[in-house]
Amino acid sequence: DNINRLYKNLGNGTFEDVSVASGSGIAVNAMTTTLGDYNNDGWFDIYITNTQSSQAGNGNVLLMNNADGTFTNVAEETGTTFNSFAWGAVFLDADNDTLLDLYVSGGFDGSIGSFLSAAFYHQQNDGTFVIPQNIGFENDTRKSYSNAIGDINNDGKPDIIVCNDIENNFLWENKTVNENNWLKVKLEGVISNRDGIGNTIEISIDGESQYRYTLAGEGYLSQNSFYEFFGTGTATEIDFIKVTWTATGTTETINNVDVNQAIIIKEGSGILSNTDIQTDNFFSMYPNPSNNGIFKLSISDNERVSLQIFDLSGRLVTKKDDLRNNDEIDVSHYHKGIYVAKISSGSNISSIKLLVN
């Protein structure tokens, strides 16, 4: 058979083919996939692009996650079939209204009948999508293969870069004008990978949540900015941000966050300020791995600091204040394994991994 495959990670180094059981085994000439929780229900949906010549039909596929291990193709109902030779695709909240929109690149140049060259789908309040007119994409008539989002001018509105076939690439600057607010979040792993790939971010405003998942590659030949974009509508404060670090299964929650800012959340350290980023290596602990259950503290400035050490479950195992350079930390009672040490002094915050043998 020629269906596409969904493999479930069993958590033990093996995978199980759940294509048929999940309803995701769609027989299309898949060119790219992208993930996004388009209906903000906490379950990630899958968008699959398709070629015009596919024997299984000409449309793209939007697999809505049913939250029970199955998916339903809702491309027709939502108006996102595209019905052309599709390549790259990306979800984005272009107008920061809290609803994810969708941009699709195509392999036709717009001169062949009704076949689209590209499409920007704007999500409506009822979960359907429309292609708005006269918003700047009228000249988006090139054969293109891939696209990605970022923020070239740091105004909180996602811009789109498009890789065209022969012609120069397109950079679509987002010039949306409205009163909506935004938040950008970048994850920095300590035990997890540094780029935060594979981890989930939830924000909540007045009981309504949005979710993002940092991908390693975005569809065909693309990589989005590692800053995840959230549109917050007219809200001026976010009740909480919750990060789930997949490598350890731990969660980290930050309450009462202002909008209209870009933040970095470092695993085990919370939000990093500009000072945090610039002084990220102001301390170390040695020898690492520990020698006879003792770490020594090395601080670039001879100032007093506070120390917290967490295990991989996120449990605080040691807390010490008023420490100075060359102070010793006894970890002889620790179980063998990896820990995270967090040092803070005034506005300086930094974290490192510790290995206890």
Set out the residue ranges of the language-model regions.
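Blade-edge motifs of beta-propeller repeat domains
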Residues: 7-28, 59, 63-84, 110, ...
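Hydrophobic loop/turn residues within beta-sheet-rich immunoglobulin-like superfamily modules
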Residues: 38, 94, 152, 233, ...
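Beta-propeller blade termini
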Residues: 8, 21, 30-40, 49, ...
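Short, solvent-exposed loop/turn segments at conserved positions within beta-propeller repeat blades
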Residues: 1-2, 53-58, 111-116, 167
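Gly/Ser/Thr/Pro-enriched helix-cap/hinge segments flanking short amphipathic alpha-helices
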Residues: 110-113, 128-279
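Hydrophobic beta-strand segments that make up the repeating blades of beta-propeller
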Residues: 1, 46-51, 102-106, 159-164, ...
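Beta-strand-rich extracellular modules
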Residues: 49, 244-248, 342-346
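C-terminal outer-membrane/trafficking sorting elements
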Residues: 206-210, 277-357
